[in-house]
Structure formats: C-alpha cells, structure tokens
Amino acid sequence: MGKPMWRCWALMLMVWFSASATAANGWEIYKSRFMTTDGRIQDTGNKNVSHTEGQGFAMLMAVHYDDRIAFDNLWNWTQSHLRNTTSGLFYWRYDPSAANPVVDKNNASDGDVLIAWALLKAGNKWQDNRYLQASDSIQKAIIASNIIQFAGRTVMLPGAYGFNKNSYVILNPSYFLFPAWRDFANRSHLQVWRQLIDDSLSLVGEMRFGQVGLPTDWAALNADGSMAPATAWPSRFSYDAIRIPLYLYWYDAKTTALVPFQLYWRNYPRLTTPAWVDVLSSNTATYNMQGGLLAVRDLTMGNLDGLSDLPGASEDYYSSSLRLLVMLARGK
C-alpha cells in the first residue's frame, strides 16, 4: 500500500511543478522578447516604442509571477523616463529612435491606472510601504487630472488634454479598469472610485452600437447624456475594445455586462471569428482572431481549458500581453 501511495504523491508533485514551470515560462518568454535589460517594454508591433500601458502591464505581470527584480527594473525605468513631476502622472509614449523620445506631454489614463494598480499589488504582496505610497500619490493625481463630472456621470478622460470638447467628451472604454478601480476604492475609501465604477458600467451597457450591439474603441458622450461612436476614429469594435470584456471578466466573471460580447461571438466558429467589426456598417475584418485576441474571446465565452500564456513564435507585444493578462484575470 505504501509504494502506490508514494507514487501517487510523486505524480501529483510532478504535475504541480510542471504547471508552475509552464506558467513561469510564459512570463520568462515575455521578458526575453519585449523587456530590455534596463526595464523598458518594447511594442514590437509599433516600431519598438514604449508606453505607460506596456510598463503597467508588465509591472502587473511581475507582481503576479513574484518577480521583484523585474518589477523594480520596470518601475525604475518608468520613473526615470516617463514621470511628469508637475502632474504626478506619466508621459504616455517613448520613442527610442527620436531625438526627443518624449514629444507628446499628455498622459494616458489607463497606463497611469495600471502603474498605480501594480504598485498597490506590489506593496501588499511584498510588504513594502514605498510602493503603496507611490500608488496612493498616482491615484490622487489621476483623480485631479483625469476624472471629471460630465452629463451627470463620473468619467475618466483618456488623457488630461484634448478629450473634453465642452459639448461632448471622448472616452476610451478599454481604459475602464474596473478591477483596479475597485482596489483603489478599498485602499482609499474614496467614493469617487465607486461612482466611477457604477457610471462606467452603465456607460458600457449603453454603448451597444449598431446591429451588432457592441462598443467602439473610442466613443463620444454628449452633454445630453447620449452616446455615439467617436467620429475621429473608425467605428470599430477592435484592438482597443477587446480589453473591455477582459477587464469586465477580471472585475466580475459572472457579470451580465459580458453578454453582448458573448452573443456576438456566438455567431462565429471559434477559429473563424473576425478580428474586428465595424459597428455601423457591420463590415468585418478579412482576417480572424489569433493569439491574445482569441484568448480574450475564450475567456469571455468560458472556454478556459485551452488557455495558455505561452505566446506563439510570431506573436507581438500586444498579443502576448493579452495572453498573459487573461491568465492574471483568471487568477492563474
């Protein structure tokens, strides 16, 4: 009896270690492909520029995979190269090939939120108050620079400049980081985060544009409270908006806010789901979802068994990021 029991335990340990190694490998591959030695994440699908989105994504991953060395490298590079000491936020884009790598002095609120969220998680995980204080400071700066009252709603502008047009505001619903906002609310006890969650959930529910009934990458909230696809961008549910169901699932895997995405994707077999759809014309991409896009679809549709954080050989930064973020959203 003893030998079979020992073999059973040995097999269980092998399976556990194998699963742990596979999980770590996804992060190790990600670092080797997209992270420089000094902590800069390169967007390989966009001329190797860097942005706060990528820094924040990777900082979250580093916390999840308990990689404090990588986290500190990422955070130190971000502070050194992207910090706006006036606003307390971060310049959104860094182009290493330019004489002035930071030309655009605007921020991207999703990047700021991701960085603050990663710092909050890091402070709690590694019991380091410096990370918590940095997160608190960024949260306050986001409230001061990017969160406003408009049309009776609490909304987060995509950047501090250029998105409030007085008669309407431009929103990017893929910046609605519900799970981060919830953690900020629990940390600070500020009502603004709860109100932002409630109003943004309502807005996503109202962004059922066209016959397909989906939100667009960019949307306009008018002063009268009505919403429409933003006219300065293609009216597509596309590469930005794919993060909406990801963040909704991360916030609440059972939320009914996922239903519009599920209903649309059920119209297509998994491997022939178009990469994007124009919500006004109903025209679709001539190519199909792959990589990280498909991972978000699988997560949303409840097809969880085949999910993997191991990127394909040709997957770029964004697709690989979505893959790993899906695993984080699952808590894996």
UniProtKB/Swiss-Prot annotation:
Residues 1-23 form the signal peptide. The active site is at residues 53, 110. Pfam families: Glyco_hydro_8. InterPro entries: 6-hairpin_glycosidase_sf, 6hp_glycosidase-like_sf, Glyco_hydro_8, Glyco_hydro_8_CS. It is an enzyme of class 3 (hydrolase). GO terms for biological process: cellulose catabolic process. Belongs to the glycosyl hydrolase 8 (cellulase D) family. This is Minor endoglucanase Y. The gene is celY.
